[in-house]
Amino acid sequence: MEEEKYLPELMAEKDSLDPSFVHASRLLAEEIEKFQGSDGKKEDEEKKYLDVISNKNIKLSERVLIPVKQYPKFNFVGKLLGPRGNSLKRLQEETGAKMSILGKGSMRDKAKEEELRKSGEAKYAHLSDELHVLIEVFAPPGEAYSRMSHALEEIKKFLVPDYNDEIRQEQLRELSYLNGSEDSGRGRGIRGRGIRIAPTAPSRGRGGAIPPPPPPGRGVLTPRGSTVTRGALPVPPVARGVPTPRARGAPTVPGYRAPPPPAHEAYEEYGYDDGYGGEYDDQTYETYDNSYATQTQSVPEYYDYGHGVSEDAYDSYAPEEWATTRSSLKAPPQRSARGGYREHPYGRY
C-alpha cells in the first residue's frame, strides 16, 4: 500500500516544486524513473513465459501518446470522444479493447483536474503523466495480440490533425442529427418537391383507381376497369404518357372489324356529347352489354317478315347520315362484303 502511494506523492511533489530548485527536481525525476523501472521489471518477470496451450486469458496494456506538443491547437480529445462519446464507444466495440484517455488535459475542468492531481490519490496519479490513450485487452494470447494490433491501427487514424478528414465529417453529421438540425432542414428541403401520388379512391364502376381525365373532347371514352365486355378485345392498362384508348366504334387493333352502328337514340341515352356526364357514369356494364348485344343481333332482323319496317327506316342508317350526325367521331368502314342494302321485297305493297 505504501508503494502505491509513494509514486503519486513523488509526482505531486515534483509538480508543486518551484523550477528554481533544479537539483531537487532532478532527484525527484530520478526517483520516479527508478520506481517505475522496478515496476516494469516485475511485470517483465511475470510475462517471461506465455502459456498458449491452456489458452488462458491474458491482459495486455499499451499507452499511446497523443501529440499535443507537436499540435497544441488541435483538439485530439474531442476527436477521440466524438459527439457524446459515441466515437470512442464504437471504436471499443469494433476492436474489442478497452480505451481510456488519461494524463494531463484529459479532464474538461482544468481547476478540478489540478485539485485531483494534488490530492495524491493513486487513481488520479495519471494526471501527472503526458496526455495518452490507455489500451487494455483481456483475451486469450492469440486473440489478445490481434485485438491490440487492430486497436493500434484504428487509434492511429484519430491522431491525425485534420479538420476535414472522413472521421471529422462523420462526426459533424452525427452532431447535426443529434441536435435535430438535420430533421428540420430535411422538412424545409422537400417543400414543393414532393412526389405527387395518384388518387387511390375507387371509381363508381367496377374498375380500380380513377384514371386521370383525358383532354376535353367529344366522343372520348376512357376504359372503366379491367373487365372485358362481349365483342371487344381486352384493353391494356393505361400508363402515364400513353394516349387514351379511342371511343366505342373505332377499332383498337389493326384488322378488327367495327360493329354495326347503333341507333341514334342510343347516343342520346348514354350521353356521349357530355363527355364525363352523369348519364354515362350511371350506366353499368350490364346495360352496355345488353345494348351492344341487341345492336349486333339487329342485322339478320332486317329481313324478318314480321317487322314490316318501311324503306325509310333503312335510309336513316345510311353511312352518309351517320357521318353528318356524328362528325366528331370516326365513321365506320364501308361494309362492302355485305353488298349494300337491298329493298324490302314487300315494301311496294
From Swiss-Prot:
SUPFAM superfamilies named among the record's database cross-references: Eukaryotic type KH-domain (KH-domain type I) (SSF54791)
Organ and tissue specificity: Highly expressed in brain, lung, kidney and small intestine. Weakly expressed in placenta, liver, spleen, thymus, ovary and colon.
PTM per Swiss-Prot/TrEMBL: Methylated.
Region (Disordered) residue spans: 182-284, 319-349
Keywords of this entry: Methylation, mRNA processing, Nucleus, Phosphoprotein, RNA-binding, SH3-binding, Transcription, Transcription regulation
MF annotations from Gene Ontology: mRNA binding; poly(A) binding; poly(U) RNA binding; SH2 domain binding; SH3 domain binding
Biological-process GO terms, alphabetical: mRNA processing; regulation of alternative mRNA splicing, via spliceosome
UniProt modified residues of type Omega-N-methylarginine: R230, R240
SMART domains linked: KH (SM00322)
GO CC entries: nucleoplasm; nucleus
Broad class of where this protein is predominantly found: nucleus
InterPro entries documented for this protein: BBP-like, KH_1_KHDC4/BBP-like, KH_dom, KH_dom_type_1_sf, Qua1_dom, Sam68-YY
Name under which the protein is recorded: KH domain-containing, RNA-binding, signal transduction-associated protein 2
Organism: Homo sapiens (Human)
Species classification: Eukaryota, Metazoa, Chordata, Craniata, Vertebrata
